[in-house]
Structures are given as C-alpha cells and as structure tokens.
Amino acid sequence: MVEADRPGKLFIGGLNTETNEKALEAVFGKYGRIVEVLLMKDRETNKSRGFAFVTFESPADAKDAARDMNGKSLDGKAIKVEQATKPSFESGRRGLPPPPRSRGPPRGLRGGRGGSGGTRGPPSRGGHMDDGGYSMNFTLSSSRGPLPVKRGPPPRSGGPPPKRSAPSGPVRSSSGMGGRAPVSRGRDGYGGPPRREPLPSRRDVYLSPRDDGYSTKDSYSSRDYPSSRDTRDYAPPPRDYTYRDYGHSSSRDDYPSRGYSDRDGYGRERDYSDHPSGGSYRDSYESYGNSRSAPPTRGPPPSYGGSSRYDDYSSSRDGYGGSRDSYTSSRSDLYSSGRDRVGRQERGLPPSMERGYPPPRDSYSSSSRGAPRGGGRGGSRSDRGGRSRY
C-alpha cells in the first residue's frame, strides 16, 4: 500500500486552503521542471482540501524539493513535503493505522472468540472464566468436561457451579436473576452441602441444568458421578435446552462428548436419548410422577429436577443397565437419600428442605420463576417447584 508513487511525485500536505496551484508551482518550480501540480479540492465546494501533489520531471529535483520544503511555512502554514505514495499519501497513511486497529479487532475477536469459542474448549479453557459463563461451561464441558468430570468433581463443583450460574444467567435470562442467584446459591450449597447432601446439590444442579442446561451437566458430571449420570439422563432434555437455550451446537456436542461421552461409553447415549427423552424419561417420571403427583408425568418433571429426576434417573438408570447400575448403586444411594429427602420435602418436611434444600428450593423457585424460558415446562416447573417447596 505504501509503495512509492511514480518517481518525482511529491505529496504536499498541511497547505493553507488559500494556497492554489499557481502558488505551489511558483514555490516548487525553483527546484526543477514541474510536470504536474495537482491540488486536491473538495468536489462540492471546490475549496482546497489542504494537500496537493507536485510531479517533477526529475526525481532528483523532487528529492531536493522535499528535503528543502518539508516543514517550511507556505502562506502561513507549515507544510509537509515527501515522496508521494501509491494510494495517495493520506489514504496510505490512514491505512497504516488500520493495521494496528485491525489488530485490535482481532484481539477483540479473539476475546469474543474465546468467550464464544470457549465452547471450542481448550482455547477458552484458560479463559472460560474470563470469557463468561458460557465459554466456561462450554469449555469445561468440552475441553475439560469429560476428564474433569471424573477428575475433579469436587473442584468442579466449586468451579462448574459458577459456570453453571453464569450460564444460567445467560442461558435462562428468564431464570437469569433468580436462576443465577439461586444457582450461585446452589453452587455455594454445592461447595458444602452438595457433597453432603448429594440430593440437594444435585437438585441445584438439576435446577441449574434446567437453568443452565450445560453447566449443570458439567456440574453433574463433575460433581457426582451419579449426577453426571443423571445429567446424562437428563442430558437429553438438557440437551434440548441447550439447543434451545444455547443454541450452541458446539456446547451440545461438548456435552455429548463430555457428559454424553459417559453416555457413549455406556452406550447409553443412544439409549438415553431415546429413553430419557422418549419414554423412560417420561415413564419414569410418570411412575414417579404418580407417586409424586401427576405434574411430573407431564414432562415438566424436570422441574422436579430433584425428586422426580432422581427417581427417574434411578429408574432410567436401572433401565440403562450395567454401567448405569454401577452408577445406579451410587446414584441410587444418593438418589434414594435424595429421594427420601425429596419425598420429605414434598411431604412437607421443612427440615430436610431447609437443611440445604433451601438454596435448591430457591433455585427451583427461581428457576421455575425464570422458567418462562421453558414455556410450558417453566409453568409446570414452577408449579412443581411450588409443590415441592411447599
């Protein structure tokens, strides 16, 4: 862009608008024969735009003129004289800054990419946190997901939950505030109670899954294997959410790879999707739902998240078979305990609920409140949430 224009062509900038071609020719003519004087004018007003091009017959004369006249005053203004560049010095000059500028955007992009690309995983991995809930979730899910799940449920609990919350915010803007806060609450809960009370944490997780869809998964997988399993079971729905909420196919994929990867390993993935989303999900809900109350059967069960899900999970788990069974055992234990708790809650045993449920409950309520996102689901969820809560 900045190649020199034809030899002997000088750019004269910073001209007084009163300076005309004749004046330029008079001033520069003394350095040698001038072939052309081109004063740039405004097309509409025909006034000088303050710069001109003077072409000398001899490049040597042009160099002399540039050396002598650069910085000199002409008609009261210090002028700039230098070899003209191809596009026209100004545009050329302007072009230079752009590179830095463009560099900046890339940077921005990079950041953005990191954020959104977080989904891609590794890259954002470092930055998920920075990037934002999303990337984090995704990243975790995608990059870290599978391993981390196994690796550091606890850490994850710590970490993912936040992620979860972040996502929940964005994901469910509806749950946004509620969801997010609750989620975070859940998270906190996670930090401690979750482990203590898998159920609640899970529930939170569930909530979040519902809310976040993703992070929950992460948290699941990370948090309790069972939960990850659950997640998986869930996963189908969350997946749906994710599609819906995130619309990130990548995250979806990540999940699949992540939480789902478990599924794949189990070979459940397919089953799951079929069962959970299809029947077992619902069926389990129904079976549970019946015990619980019809609402779950509706399919909103998710709102139950906690109880129905647990149950469902357990059932689906069983249905899923061995791997699941192994999980099941742990899961079921968690679940059973969770279930009991849940049952209690439903029954109206405030203590258990309060015990560590409260956050979850809040999260539920919040999620249910924020549920708008889910639409019907949301509604049922809220109902359910209300029920379970009260």
UniProtKB/Swiss-Prot annotation:
Subunit: Homomultimer. Found in the supraspliceosome complex Identified in the spliceosome C complex. Interacts with KHDRBS3. Forms a complex with ILF2, ILF3, YLPM1, KHDRBS1, NCOA5 and PPP1CA. Interacts with SAFB/SAFB1. Interacts with ERAP1; the interaction is RNA-independent. Interacts with CLK2, KHDRBS2, SAFB, TRA2B and YTHDC1. Interacts with PPIA/CYPA.
Domain-level remarks: The RRM domain is necessary for RNA-binding, but not for splice site selection, indicating that its splicing activity does not require direct binding to RNA.
Biological processes, Gene Ontology terms: cellular response to interleukin-1; membrane protein ectodomain proteolysis; mRNA splice site recognition; positive regulation of DNA-templated transcription; positive regulation of mRNA splicing, via spliceosome; positive regulation of transcription by RNA polymerase II; regulation of alternative mRNA splicing, via spliceosome; regulation of postsynapse organization
Annotated ranges, domain RRM: 8-86
PTM-bearing positions, type N6-acetyllysine: 30
Modified positions (N-acetylmethionine) in chain numbering: 1
Name of the protein in its database record: RNA-binding motif protein, X chromosome
Main location: nucleus
Biased composition (Low complexity): 323-337, 362-371
Bias-annotated ranges (Basic and acidic residues): 60-80, 194-215, 241-274, 338-347, 380-390
Species the sequence originates in: Rattus norvegicus
Protein location: Nucleus
Keyword Zinc-finger: no
UniProt keywords, alphabetically: Acetylation, Glycoprotein, Isopeptide bond, Methylation, mRNA processing, mRNA splicing, Nucleus, Phosphoprotein, Repressor, Ribonucleoprotein, RNA-binding, Spliceosome, Transcription, Tumor suppressor, Ubl conjugation
One of the record's GO cellular component terms: spliceosomal complex
